[in-house]
Each structure stands twice: as structure tokens, then as C-alpha cells.
Amino acid sequence: MNIAPSLAGLAAVSLAVAPDARAQEIAPRSEEPGAHADEDAHEEEEGEENVVQGTRSRRRIQDEPIRVELVTREEIEEKLLMRPGNIAMLVNEIGGIRVQVTSPALGAANIRIQGMEGRYTQLLADGLPLYGGQSPALGLLQIPPTDLGQVEVIKGAASALYGPSALGGVINLVSRRPGDEAEAEMLLNATTRGGGDLTGYLATPLGSGWSASVTGGAHRQDADDLDGDGWLDIAAHRRWTIRPRLFWRSESGASLYATVGAMTEDRTGGTRPGRTVPDGSFFPQTQATDRLDAGLAAEMPAGGIGTLHLRASHSVQDHRHLFGDVREDDRHATSFAEASVAGRSDATIWVAGAAFQRDLFRSETFPAFDFSYRAPALFGQIEHDLRPNLTLAASARVDFHSEYGTQFSPRLSALYKPGFWTIRASAGRGFYAPTPFVDEIEAAGLSRLEPLSGIEAETARNASLDIGYARGPFEGSVTVFASTIEGAARLETVSPTRVRLVNADGPTRIAGSELLLRYRRDGFTVTGSYVFVDASELGEGAGAPRRQVPLVPRHSAGLVAMWEEHGRGRIGLEVYRTGRQPLEDNPYRTESRPYSHVGLLGEIVLGKVSLFANAENILNVRQTRDDPLLLPARAPDGRWTVDVWAPTEGFVLNGGLRLRFGGH
């Protein structure tokens, strides 16, 4: 697909600091015990409510038995000024979530929730798998936050809600809805590392319940070899995106949402022109991506039963890879459809439905890895208020997977709100349908992988307990969680140039806790967070002892201070500390160094125009200051680099302007 010209035209038309994720803001804002828990300060000030889209029950966030963390539009705007081109920074600074770089050559990354592998995280857009059922590692870097209204995060096994791709959790990107007046925004950004972004958003009511929006963007990044070793520490890319949306709502409560999206990107990394890797060969690494998708969601009253919900989507991604002298061309496609009926009484909410998803992969170069997974499913969910402050919830799903058989995924949750306290407990089970694309293969390609044989589904059990308290300007929460993963897929070395994918012999065990403290007063917000994760697995080989899971820091913490006044501007300071991480197959060290990340953001609003500047990684932490990225010899899986455990781009300064027109 050559979609660049059409994207350029559509983008031209569309263009005519830290997200301290509201972890269900764990307790009442009111000074009266028994008031609704978790109410957001901005909801009170503006008279708005945050309704969760990702759990099907459509409750207010404070009434959800399942813990849902929320990043609001205000917090999204802070991150939009820091990194307009993608959502990596937005989700990376949510407690318990880590964006892990999986390919130093191209900068690809995935989302790890509470120490679990990134492939277990389901990324949705308005509840639809528009970025694929099993999101590729580069997908995270290709989604701009321009038109996001909120981000919902469900941690832990969520297969009972969304099937096999949600073993570790769900991140649902909810788009902005047009208001009563037409509005438009344009943002121009440039960085000291040769990056640039131009994004635009246009939304307007159309009358008779109809409204529409369109988002477009052009993004660029120049390549850079910061340490002069001939290997590009920052990959180059050129990307265009466009996404129109159509909305309709009737007075009867029926609604319709439709969207199409397109993206094209060329990304270049590996060796610089004329430079070589240690064996004397050139090793350029490139990836060209074209993505097209479409999605539809509708709901309508179903007689006296309840509400009928219909959802469907289809996405296609074509890739053209180059790994040194090996070219790999492939296509990923995901088709999804779901129908459900939801009803409610005074104390009970129920949902029942059926779903179907097909995930397809076709490789022109290595057809032995082609697959087509088909998974029809039945699911149900019920929530019951035993008392005004006590709610129980149960959900279950049965997937009839074409490759991995029948899989049952249950989840139980409870919510108790005694006075200013909020207590949530949850436990669930889920599964994941393995594919060849573990992190190492995403980074190095399929050329050295043995054809898959005898792989079984990966399964996990998960439990969590959340206790929170809030009163006046203070709030805090403590979360403890534990997961056990059976049959985790990982690579095993067969020879110096071949690897195979196998299920781990023993369980991967993860346990940890999250702590959040926040203070708000007169436009000032100070948030402190701490995360502890203990993740262990069996080592490779017969009789190997247990070891810590690589690239999972046991300790990480953050402190964010932000002042904002609408119509004037904002200023924010963020400090994050990442502890030591176990490393694997790294000849330079077995454990990473701890490091600190400091950022400073400022914005001045001058009517319809705002000017902003952001300093990121002020301490100029860079992994290549300690060790090379390049390996002395190529790894059996085909990689030429060690794993990334610290920033690779060093200090970056970005700034620009934002224009707003119309709206309220």
C-alpha cells in the first residue's frame, strides 16, 4: 500500500507532566463519610463525571469494582507538550507500568504492566483492537495523543473481558468527543535531537445528533550516533497519520461511532552508512509500515430487555523489514466482531454476549511462520450492589481457539467503600495465544528461528488488593498484587546461529506493591509514587535455579510537582528513579546501574496561542556512557545489541507552539 499521497492531502485538510493516573481516586472528595469514592477534583469543579468505557458496565469510575486507573485529558495535554508524536511517555509514567525498548536499532517498545511481558498487554482504541489483536512493538511509537480524551488502564489478567491478548492487562485509548461548538487545534514541535511534529485536530457538530472529528499528523526524527561507534543510537523516521471519526446519538439513547485510520512510516537504524559491526559487515536495519483500519460501535435500546451493543473492526498492517542483508516482508491482519446485551435493575448490572476475532500473519520471506488464529467466544458479566457501599462483580469468558483449544477465563472483583476508605479486591485467570513474536524476534527477525512446534498456550493467575483513603486535599493508596504465569514462551539456543521457541518448564512468579500519595491545593498538585516488583523464573537448562526476570527493576519511584492555572499556563517538575535491573546475555555487566530521570515543563498561554518548552533527561543519563550497545559478536537470535536498560538519547530539549480556535 502506498498511502503517503492520500495521507498528505487528508492531513492538510485536518490541519485547515506527568500523568499521575487517577487510580480510581480511591476515596470520597466530600467531607461526609459515605459519599461516592474516588471522585476526581476536576469532576467536582466542572460538574463532570468520568464513565469507564473499558469494562462494559458503563459505571462511574468511583463505582467500578474492577480497579481502573484513569489518565484525564488535562494530564494527556501535559504529555502532549512533552512528546506529541507518540504515547510512550504518557503510559510510561503511570505507576506499575514500564515502557520497555525491545529493539535498540529501531527504538521499538512495548508496555509491561506490573512486571509482566509486554506482549500480554492489549492496546485498544475506543474498545476496539484497531492496532491489531497482538500489538506490534512499534505500534506504541506510532500513536499520537492528539485526540485522546482519556486513557483507561486495567492491570492484571483481563482475558475475561477481552480474550487472549489481555493476559497482563488492558490500555484503552478513549478519543475526544466533539462539543456543541466547532473547535480546532494545531501543534508545532521541534527537538534538539532533530525531531519534529505537526499535529492537528478539528471537531464540529453536524446537526440532528451527528458530529465529526479528524486528526492528522506529520512526524520526523533524524538519525544520530551519539557515541560515535557507527551504530545509530537514535533511529530516523518519517511518519504520516490521519484519522476521521463520526459520532451520532439520538434522543432515545441509540448511538453510533465509526472511524477509519491510516498511517505510513519509514524507520531506519542499525549501522551508519560506511560503518560496520564487529564482524566487518554492514548491518542497516529498516522497517516500512503501512496501516489501514476501520472500526464501528453501535448501541440501541432492545425492547424491555436492556441495550444492544455491536462492535466490529478490521486492521491491516504491511511491513517491509531489512535486517542486514535479509529482507522480510509480511502482513498482519486482525478482524473483530462482538454483539452483547446489557441490562440493569436497581442493584444489578448484567452483560451477556458473543465475540469473534481472527489474527492473521503472512510472511513472503518465511511462510513457515504463517498463522491464522480464529477465536469465537461467549462471555458474561454481572455486578450486584449488596449494600450502598458494597459491590460484587463476576465475569467469565470461554474462547474456542482454533490453535489452543477451549480456554476459560474467569474474574471476580469486590468494592467496599466504608466512609473515606475504598477497598477493592480482584482475582482472575487468563491465557495468551503464542506467536513467533517474542521481544527478541521482534528485534532481530525470523531468519534464525526454528519453525514453531509443540508450543502450548501461556496462562496466568492474578490477584490484587487496593486500599485507598482521601479527604480534602490529601489522598493515598496502597496496592499489592501477585501473578503466576505457566508455560511462558521464551527462546532457547539450539546452535550459535539458531534458536527455538519453547514453553518455560516452571512458573514465572511476580509479586509486588504500589504506593501513591497526592496533595492538591489551588492549582498545585504534588504526587509521589513507589513501585516494588519481585519477578522470578527458572533459569535455562536442566536443574537450573530460579533467577530474577531480566529488565524488571525491583524498585522504582517518582515525584511530580505541577502548577496550572487555566488561561495562564503551567509549570511542572518530575523526578523518577529506576533501580537496578537484572540483565541477560550482556557481556559488559549482569546488573544495570540505577539512574534518575529529571524533566521540567513550562507553558505560557497567550489567548488562543500557547508557547511551551520541555527539558527531558536533564541529568543527561545515557546507557552508552557506561557500556556499548553493540555486542562483540552477533547473538544466536540475530541481534547485534544488548538490551536497553537506560535512556539512549540523553538530554533532549523540545519546544513549540499550540493554536486553538473555537470551542468553549
Where does each model-flagged region fall?
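Short, acidic, small-residue-rich periplasmic hinge/interaction motif at the N-terminus
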Residues: 25-78, 118
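C-terminal beta-signal and adjacent terminal beta-strands/loops
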Residues: 486, 577-582, 603-664
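Non-catalytic regulatory/gating segments with a bias toward low-complexity or hydrophobic composition
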Residues: 91, 151-152, 171-173
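Short acidic/polar hinge/loop motifs at secondary-structure boundaries
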Residues: 110-112, 128-155
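Periplasmic-side early beta-strands and strand-to-turn transitions of outer-membrane beta-barrels
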Residues: 159-160, 172, 180-181, 187-189, ...
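Outer-membrane beta-barrel signature, preferentially recognizing the C-terminal barrel domain
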Residues: 275-302, 422, 426-486, 493-520, ...
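Structural signature of Gram-negative outer-membrane beta-barrels, strongest in the C-terminal barrel
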Residues: 249, 259-261, 298, 347-351, ...
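Gram-negative outer-membrane beta-barrel transporters
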Residues: 385-392, 480-485, 504-585, 656-663
